[in-house]
Swiss-Prot record:
The RNAP catalytic core consists of 2 alpha, 1 beta, 1 beta' and 1 omega subunit. When a sigma factor is associated with the core the holoenzyme is formed, which can initiate transcription. It comes from Streptococcus equi subsp. zooepidemicus (strain H70). Binds 1 Mg(2+) ion per subunit. This is DNA-directed RNA polymerase subunit beta'. GO terms for molecular function: DNA binding; DNA-directed RNA polymerase activity; magnesium ion binding; zinc ion binding.
Length: 1211
């Protein structure tokens, strides 16, 4: 076998007949498979041991030679070589075809490669190949045209007319083979290149296509006649197995049936030829042979598929590769693994951040080999077999061994669907009773897991390297930040939030208010004994907490706080300020001075002068976690998170919040508000009946009235709510529910959507406390049902989007430190009309500058060129009033097959500069795809008001952008730079004309009457500026402006969609994806290069080709950039393995074979397919051969004692 990690590239070409013979170990002559009595393979049949190798290891067919010592001997009785049975997976056979047969991929694919090579239509080819017409191969001296078709009758007439042997015409694949042999590639290519200089239109397109195929044959060394098969390879028998079922029946792969048909027809044809049968019979047999081979290669591609029992189409070779169940996606890109298990998950509130609970029964099965080894090492058993028996019997001693084996051995937990890299994390196992896996509550958000019956899979990393990677890179405690936006992903939720909210509440006049304590312990003791309430404001000596960062003026004083806040601050990292107010100032700058008093001052007066603070909500906890991470990194943060979780659970239990129907308040003036709304609606309807408004206007007015009524109720609800009400506490803290849920419980449910998506005018006036009437209940069911179906559809759509995104960007890896480009991207805040979608500060964080940034007023340099912009620096730049900054960007990076560290900036998941080897493409794809399920599905219908078209939003809009489709509601853009001089309306055609006067000429643009204008007379417009509202078509923009403008536009558009749904995604992720869509150029004029006009190629390859020509003094080629949708971009990638495993497998492979494509295995996917370590992270070539140095431990200890320095183990 080939050593997987030894080869650099993989090439695919057409197989010549001699190549097929060299692979083969013998000819399969009979259609038999195995003998029904002896169940042994038949001689010369499809499973023959002589050809394919023995069925049992080291044993020939007749049994003369058994055992390994006869290795390599060929038995003299039965002719079978004594070797491993495994060779039956590798050895091929062949069938000598008695008539040439065309390969359906090359004849039937689109475009037909055979047709282009011969310049014949696929229709004509089909008539010849399937014996419906003759083709003239050599007209000799007759006036016939070469390659022209003759029917049976015409052929006979011509023979009579010109005499026998006066010209050559044949039918069948044989004729095509003769024609293909006559193709002179070099002259044809030269002729086509000449023709291209003058050709236009359809003719030019056809010439370019032909030239492409002929050039591929010429360069690859494939011969066109190899598209016709004279000899058919037979794949190894173990790849098309035949197995006996209970009851003596056999189940065989469909391929065996298909091969049998070919052999039967081939043998029959041989017999007919021997007998000199009449031409028509032979012809018919040849056609049937052709059809049999077609079915074997791609059943159902031409005509009706051959069916097996129960009229089920048989699975041919092509079907084995295609689709989700094909070889690529089912067995090469994803495999089932051993040492894995799955079970239901339950919550493990007592676990540490890096732990998970694994049931004992599960662990013993997963760690069986490790336990067995240890049993033998401790001599509890003599050999492995005995040890295995011990484990299976459940001997008492195995449990202690198991405890030791799993120490420090991380396991991976995965929850499907794995939408981003946080869907698989590593934990240290803790043995538990029961049968459910225990999961730490804080990692639920990353997994999107809950405990209502979710299941998770567990995997054991076996090798030392795998364990080290799991521990260092995948441990759950390391994954504090979300890779998509750099915000903490492990924020507490539900009970944890509620407990900390309750803990930090303040209340006036509770028992013990104004007491002063010397330290924390005294305060807690007083609280435990009931002298002081958790929410009472009390004093505490500042000096009892010496490690906190107090200001000098605050030391030796007494601070006003609550017992709850003393407990809350006790779990905080030491260097964090004492948190008194839930705001960022307190968190970053320190505790405000107003809470401190001198000893001896009247504390009650100070307390009365202070306002009551609001408690800490979910958002505040998130900010505290982010600040902690920023200051102390992962280890301290994960320890702090565990303390926060424990405190939250403990106090939410103590608080004992319950919910009853009486907790839902009654709004005192609900009846009045609704009465007023009814009155207003009546007036509107009256106005409509009098003809003062249109139906559309009436509809909008009515729905607005009800919306306002609902908002009035909501407002009243917020004004009158009691902060101690349990429901209010849950909602306010962010533990569960929001204002909309609350207003449905206590206010009114409001307007509902009808099945057609239009909002119904009749609102639901009741709330859930009063109860709904039957009609109201019926109205609300539609919305509920739509919600469910939408979610189901959205999940599939979003998953498919993620798959396409991953595919197009999987080979983008950080490949070098600095690409040294001199280009940059000028960025400013992204705005949508007046609203800011993304601020400049957010966009600057974690990027490198391209030029130095100066203060706009003083002119001082705030930050130099090529420096990393930190969070604080970004704030400083924005505060100085800078509006635009030139930064290093993925768009302008010059690295081939990837990005450099400086153009990328920081890795959002760690907060540090990105490392070489990081697979940023995959992370970008996951970051954009994972929130896809949160986007809405609907395209908004505005009820035919105030807008010319329905704007696409949510997921459909994201797909529209990434697939580079023409958008719905397209905006008209200007192609000239200048001034809008006039907008004239033409009532007859219902259009408006916009005239733009530029320096070189005048632009005239026709826009629909209903379109909303973005420009007025006198406005200055740039090329590519939108004249009307709507989405710009990116391909059109690319023609008018440059690549960078299109990239910037697409980036802004994607961000608008996500931000409008409240989803934050780092710019750099979108940049990576958009750059992949624009990485190709189309050659316009080849100049002196040997490029072909009209070919698509990578920008880097195009630049290289031009460099060579310019050096040698020739004319360089010209090209124009091409914008491709992500699906097209994936299929156009340089790696045929990656493209074939994505979509259109047969088309990709056909093309790759003709071109003799080489796959240099640069991306991740190609390497997964052939089983190499992926070239990212620790798998990069630079880390390939690192060997951990073994060190004699004794020496280290002695040296350490001698020098009294800690021992350092060398890498």
């Amino acid at each position: 076998m080939v050593d997987v990690n030894r080869f650099k590239s993989m090439q695919i070409t057409l197989a010549s007949p001699s190549k097929v013979r060299s692979w083969s170990y013998g000819e399969v002559k009979k259609p038999e498979t195995i003998n029904y009595r002896t169940l042994k393979p038949e001689r010369e049949g499809l499973f023959d041991e002589v050809i394919f190798g023995p069925t049992k290891d080291w044993e020939c067919a007749c049994g003369k030679y058994k055992r390994i010592r006869y290795k390599g001997i060929v038995c003299d009785r039965c002719g079978v070589e004594v070797t491993r049975a495994k060779v039956r997976r590798e050895r091929m056979g062949h069938i000598e075809l008695k008539a040439p047969v065309s390969h359906i991929w090359y004849f039937k694919g689109i475009p037909s490669r055979m047709g282009l090579t011969l310049d014949m239509s696929p229709r004509a080819l089909e008539e010849v190949i399937y014996f419906a017409a003759y083709v003239v191969i050599d007209p000799k001296d007759t006036p016939l045209e070469p390659k022209s078709l003759l029917t049976e009758r015409e052929y006979r007439e011509k023979i009579q007319e010109y005499g026998h042997g006066s010209f050559i015409a044949k039918m069948g694949a044989e004729a095509i083979q003769d024609l293909l042999k006559r193709v002179d590639l070099v002259t044809e290519i030269a002729e086509l290149k000449e023709e291209l200089k003058t050709a236009t239109g359809q003719k030019r397109i056809k010439a370019v296509r032909r030239l492409d195929v002929l050039d591929a044959f010429n360069k690859s060394g494939n011969k066109p006649e190899w598209m016709i098969l004279n000899i058919l390879p037979v794949i190894p028998p173990d790849l098309r197995p035949m197995v006996q079922l209970d009851g003596g029946r056999f189940a065989a792969s469909d391929l065996n049936d298909l091969y049998r048909r070919v052999i039967n027809r081939n043998n029959r044809l041989a017999r007919l030829l021997e007998l000199n049968a009449p031409g028509i019979i032979v012809q018919n047999e040849k056609r049937m042979l052709q059809e049999a081979v077609d079915a074997l290669i791609d059943n159902g591609r031409r005509g009706r598929p051959i069916t097996g029992p129960g009229s089920r189409p048989l699975k041919s070779l092509s079907h084995m590769l295609k689709g989700k169940q094909g070889r690529f996606r089912q067995n090469l890109l994803g495999k089932r693994v051993d040492f894995s298990g799955r079970s239901v998950i339950a919550v493990g509130p007592t676990l540490k951040m890096y732990q998970c609970g694994v049931p004992r029964e599960m662990a013993i099965e997963l760690f069986k080999p490790f336990v067995m080894r240890e049993i033998v090492a401790r001599e509890f058993a003599g050999n492995v077999k005995a040890a295995k028996r011990m484990v299976e019997r459940g001997d008492e001693r195995i449990w202690d061994i198991l405890e030791e084996v799993i120490k420090e051995h991380p396991v991976l937990l995965n929850r499907a669907p794995t939408l981003h890299r946080l869907g698989i994390q590593a934990f240290e196992p803790v043995l538990i009773d029961g049968k459910a896996l225990r999961l730490h509550p804080l990692v639920c958000e990353a997994y999107n897991a809950d405990f209502d019956g979710d299941q998770m899979a567990i995997h054991v990393p076996l090798s030392e390297e795998a364990q080290a990677e799991a521990r260092l890179l995948m441990l759950a405690a390391e994954h504090i930040l979300n890779p998509k936006d750099g915000k903490p992903v492990v924020t507490p939720s539900q009970d944890m939030v509620l407990g900390n909210y309750y803990l930090t509440m303040e209340d006036a006049g509770r028992e013990g208010e104004g007491m002063i304590f010397k330290d924390k312990d005294e305060a807690v003791m007083a609280y435990r004994n009931g002298y002081v309430h958790l929410h009472s404001r009390v004093g505490i000596a500042v000096d009892s907490m010496p490690s906190k960062p107090w200001k000098d003026s605050q030391r030796h004083k007494i601070m006003v706080t609550t017992v709850g806040k003393i407990l809350f601050n006790d779990i905080m990292p030491e260097d964090l300020p004492y948190l008194q107010e839930p705001n960022n100032a307190n968190l970053t700058e320190g505790t405000p001075d107003k809470y401190f008093l001198e000893p001896g001052q009247n504390i009650q007066e100070v307390i009365d002068s202070l306002p009551i603070n609001v408690p800490f909500k979910k958002k505040n906890l998130g900010n505290i976690i982010a600040e902690t991470f920023k200051r102390f990194r992962t280890t301290e943060t994960s320890a702090f998170l565990d303390r926060l979780k424990d405190l939250g659970y403990y106090h939410s239990t103590l608080a004992g919040l319950t919910v009853g129907i009486a907790d839902i308040p009654v709004i005192d003036n609900k009846a009045e508000i609704i009465e007023a709304a009814h009155h207003r609606v009546e007036e509107i309807n009256k106005a409509f009946r009098r003809g003062l408004m249109t139906d559309d206007d009436r509809y909008v007015a009515v729905t607005t009235t009800w919306r306002e009524a609902k908002e009035a109720l909501e407002k009243r609800l917020i004004e009158t709510q009691d902060p101690k009400n349990p429901i209010v506490m849950m909602m306010d803290s962010g533990a569960r529910g929001n204002i909309s849920n609350f207003s449905q419980l206590a206010g009114m449910r409001g307007l509902m959507a009808a099945p057609n998506g239009r909002i119904m005018e009749l609102p639901i006036l009741s709330n859930f406390r009063e109860g709904l009437s039957v009609l109201e209940m019926f109205f609300s069911t539609h919305g509920a049902r739509k919600g469910m179906t939408d979610t189901a559809l959205k999940t599939a759509d979003s998953g498919y989007l993620t798959r396409r995104l991953v595919d197009v960007a999987q080979d983008v890896i950080i490949r070098e430190d600095d690409c040294g480009t001199d280009r940059g991207l000028l960025i400013r805040a992204i705005t949508d009309g007046k609203e800011v979608t993304e601020t400049l500060e957010e966009r600057l964080q974690g990027r490198y500058t391209r030029k130095s940034v100066k203060h706009p007023e003083t002119g001082e340099v705030l930050i130099g060129a090529d420096q990393l912009i930190t969070e604080d620096m970004a704030r400083k730049i924005v505060d100085a009033g800078v509006e635009e900054v030139t930064i290093r960007s993925v768009f302008t990076c010059a690295t081939r097959h990837g990005v450099c560290r400086h153009c990328y900036g920081i890795n959002l998941a760690t907060g540090d500069a990105v490392e070489v080897g990081e697979a940023v493409g995959t992370i970008a794809a996951q970051s954009i795809g994972e929130p896809g399920t949160q986007l809405t599905m609907r395209t908004f219908h505005t009820g035919g008001v105030a807008s010319n078209t329905d704007i696409t939003q949510g997921l459909p809009r994201i797909q529209e952008i990434f697939e580079a489709r023409n958008p719905k509601g397209e905006a008209v853009i200007t192609e000239v730079k200048g001034t809008v001089i006039e907008i004239e309306e033409d009532a007859s055609t219902r259009t408006k004309k916009v005239y733009v006067q530029g320096k070189t000429g005048m632009g005239e643009y026709v826009v629909p009457f209903t379109a909303r204008m973005k420009v007025e007379v006198g406005d200055e417009v740039n090329r590519g500026a939108a004249l009307t509202e709507g989405s710009i078509q990116p391909k059109h923009l690319l023609e008018v402006r440059d690549t960078l403008s299109v990239e910037t536009y697409l980036l802004a558009e994607v961000q608008k969609v996500y931000r409008s749904q409240g989803v934050e995604i780092g710019d750099k992720h979108v940049e990576v994806m958009v750059r992949q869509m624009l990485r190709k150029v189309r050659v316009m004029d080849p100049g002196d290069t040997d490029l072909l006009p009209g070919t698509l190629m990578d920008i880097a390859d195009f630049t290289d080709a031009n460099k060579e020509i310019v050096i040698s003094g020739g004319i360089p080629a010209t090209s124009r950039p091409v914008l491709m949708g992500i699906t097209k971009a994936s299929l156009e990638t340089n790696s045929f393995l990656s493209a074939a495993s994505f979509q259109e497998t047969t088309r990709v492979l056909t093309d790759a074979a003709i071109r003799g494509k080489k796959d240099h295995l640069l991306g991740l996917k190609e390497n997964v397919i052939i089983g190499k370590i992926i070239p990212a992270g620790t798998g990069m070539v630079r880390y390939r051969n690192i060997e951990p140095q073994a060190i004699n431990e004794v020496e280290v200890i002695e040296e350490a004692e001698a020098t009294e320095e800690p021992a350092i183990i060398k890498e």
